[in-house]
Amino acid sequence: MDKAVAGVPRWDLSSIFSSFDGNDYKDALIEYTSGMDSLDKRLKDEKGQMNDFCQWLADYLAASNKVGALEESLNAYAYTAYSTDTTNTDYLNNLSKLEEMSLQSKAQGLVFQDILTRNSQDLSTFYTSFPQFAQYKYVLEQIIEDGRHRMSQAEEQLADDLCRTGGAAWSRLHEQVISNLMDSATGKTFNEIRNEAYSPDASVRRKAWETEISLLKSMEIPVAAALNNIKGATVALNRRRGWNHALSRALSSANMGEKTLAALIGAIEDSLPFWRKYLQLKGRLLAGAGSTCSVAGSGAASPSGELGTDSNAVGETGCHFYDMFAPLPQPYSRAGSSCGAKAGSSGVSETHDSSVKMDGWTFEEARNYITEKFYGFSKDMGDFARTAFENNWIDAEVRKGKVGGAYCIDFPSKGVSRVLSNFTGSFSDVTTLAHELGHAYHHHCIAGLDYGLIHYPMTLAETASIFAENIIMKDVIGRCEGFDKLQLMELHLQDSCQVLVDILSRFYFERSVFEEREKGELSASDFCRLMAQAQEKSYGNGLSSQRHEYMWAVKTHYYSPDLDFYNFPYAFGLLFALGLHAQYQQQGASFAEKYQSLLKDTGSFSCEEVCRRAGFDIETKEFWAAGIASFNSELEALLDYEKSLAKA
């Protein structure tokens, strides 16, 4: 392992369960199965439902909350083990076993839905008689509404059963294929290769990009088959369930209306000239500093492997795809520093005297810095971060067989979370850690609620994570001067461009995939064509003519049979988080309590209602445009920097 990332931890799961063979895990399985059997009996108790439905419902919800929390925790434990070693057949078999056991839970959900619908006229009395369940009003109404898009119980149970060897199996195949890709020439894993996109060395970025494309192309047939079959199954099931389009189902799952989505997408589309201007500027800055392989005479390797100038560099002003994550090139060698971005060993209120590092971070530095900044927002958030780090909640080591990217997963029965990342020492890795810990903090805020009230939609799930990222970015940018400040502003624009422009391309891609999949089978060449079109429509002349046509093979969200359009929630989260951060800057420390209350509400109301409670009208394009406008000053600063270079 590189010296810069020595000491990167693996997580400790022992406080959750000792092992799959441990008595605590076996006892939990027994408790889970007996709890499921008890719920079956309650669902069959027609006499109790008829005599006193309100009492029956109160008892059922209490019992269901306990069983549901345990079920999710068992599944989370199985997935955390599997995701760090996808080659382990025991882990895979255990995950499959739990998925099979979960079928009983899904079947119970269908029966409960029917019972609730038949007795919906009693719900007003229920909320009055049992005020402790008054906050369930929106949740129960959504269950009834979802029942309008459902097949028969027998058909739904069959669909769930078939998914284990259908959609879920195709999804695992994708994970296994991608997580085990390796460059035979260097021995580097796929995750290590993708992380080289952040290298300051242009030749490293270019070579990594070519290797990534080559590896993905070598596995295009099985990966395309996985995506084709997952989306095909979704199309068939949506048709049977009465959904007009997968997007309608996604909006329902997101507790969000079409008017809100139209306003969000419209605002992003209106901002595309701004983001293309940024990307063109980045391309010019890299070319001017000789920090790209795509300028004449650079001796760069072309896609064919020959040395020379990239053929599509001639006459183009856009940034090259493999340069999008390149650090801003330094105009000269600096001594000393202009701001501090590393925390001291205590992690709190240290004097900073080191420059901002775009790479070379140790995990300890990241830990101390994040903890300190979270304390700057509130003691509760700081205490939470300290607990997560001190108790090894994070698996950050890059290794073969481990899934790429990053995620946060919750264990409701234990009231804790775990975070997976692939830490290589870049500043982007630091913000990724903050992002995932933001998710975990969200769970921390709702941990005391009933299990039935903690299921927030995808849109609001991204708000807490991006808010946590903003705490880091705003702090660093605010304390920096000179080139350090410019470097961080560019990184902020880079990340936000991904959340808005790249997310828009993913939205376009998935929408077109569903439209074409309804007409017939799709192959790897079809997916490449649709991805190139989506990137052209979103990035346009912000990029050179190069496109990453295999991006569909990289993003795991496309391969979830139950989760379509997991793209616009990121844009929602970013812009909503910017609005919240603006309130924080206005209100100061008193905002922390309001923020906690907002996070607690996310599983109890629609997106529109949660946002109204926070003082926002998200059904207007103006709201989203205001968030995007906050980036104007950063781009202007970079344009001024370019002018200063021209004068030098």
Residue ranges and their predicted role:
Residues 4-7, 14, 20, 112, ...:
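C-terminal, non-catalytic "cap/extension" segments appended to globular domains
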Residues 236, 282-294, 314-329, 346-351, ...:
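A glycine-rich phosphate-binding loop feature that marks nucleotide/adenosyl-phosphate handling sites
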Residues 372, 376-383, 409, 439-450, ...:
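Conserved helix-loop functional segments at active or binding sites
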Residues 457-484, 492-493, 498, 573:
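Post-HExxH zinc-binding segment in Zn-dependent metallohydrolases
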